[in-house]
């Protein structure tokens, strides 16, 4: 992981990551350690699928812990209240419509750590967010997406 990369996120996103880290350390880690102990008690580890499974889960868990710790260490909290209220940025809800005549869509732009497209939270690293960030209400913006280029008009920007 690059040491100089920051992870833009809202305060809410940071709190969510802190809670996840606490759960990983306090609940999940001891549970997996206990499963490893139980699997060891079965004897021969060379053919012990429970042991192998628990060790694999432990490896995934420890990697997730390291990732979350790194993201929190290099978190850049975005205070959307300090950004022009008409400018699209992390922590803002943006409503736009694809031109010429599509229905309006609204998304909250968040850091990658808190993105959840199923609930309308898109990562600042996504093509749509990258194309919108820095633009203002009433602007028409050409956005490069994997399927080509889409032109949108920004209708509204508000704090999340």
Swiss-Prot record:
GO BP terms, alphabetized: DNA-templated transcription elongation; regulation of DNA-templated transcription elongation
Coiled coil: 9-73
Transferase keyword on record: no
Keywords: Coiled coil, DNA-binding, Transcription, Transcription regulation
Pfam families (UniProt xref): GreA_GreB, GreA_GreB_N
GO molecular function: DNA binding; RNA polymerase binding
Alphabetized InterPro entries for the sequence: GreA/GreB_C_sf, TF_GreA/GreB_CS, Tscrpt_elong_fac_GreA, Tscrpt_elong_fac_GreA/B, Tscrpt_elong_fac_GreA/B_C, Tscrpt_elong_fac_GreA/B_fam, Tscrpt_elong_fac_GreA/B_N, Tscrpt_elong_fac_GreA/B_N_sf
PROSITE patterns: GREAB_1, GREAB_2
Family: Belongs to the GreA/GreB family.
NCBIfam families according to UniProt: greA (TIGR01462), PRK00226.1-4 (NF001263)
Functional description taken from the UniProt entry: Necessary for efficient RNA polymerase transcription elongation past template-encoded arresting sites. The arresting sites in DNA have the property of trapping a certain fraction of elongating RNA polymerases that pass through, resulting in locked ternary complexes. Cleavage of the nascent transcript by cleavage factors such as GreA or GreB allows the resumption of elongation from the new 3'terminus. GreA releases sequences of 2 to 3 nucleotides.
Official protein name in the record: Transcription elongation factor GreA 2
């Amino acid at each position: 992981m690059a040491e100089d990369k920051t992870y833009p996120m809202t305060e809410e996103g940071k709190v969510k990551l802190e809670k996840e880290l606490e759960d990983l350390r306090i609940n999940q880690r001891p549970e997996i350690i206990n499963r490893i102990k139980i699997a060891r008690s079965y004897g021969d580890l060379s053919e012990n699928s429970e042991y192998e499974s628990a060790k694999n889960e432990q490896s995934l868990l420890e990697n997730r812990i390291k990732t979350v710790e790194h993201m929190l260490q290099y978190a850049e909290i975005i205070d959307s209240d300090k950004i022009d209220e008409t400018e699209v940025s992390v922590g803002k809800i943006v409503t736009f419509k694809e031109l010429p005549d599509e229905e309006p869509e609204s998304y909250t732009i968040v850091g990658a750590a808190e993105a959840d497209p199923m609930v309308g939270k898109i990562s600042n690293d996504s093509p749509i967010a990258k194309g919108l960030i820095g633009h203002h209400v009433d602007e028409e913006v050409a956005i490069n997406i994997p399927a080509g280029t889409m032109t949108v008009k920004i209708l509204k920007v508000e704090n999340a």
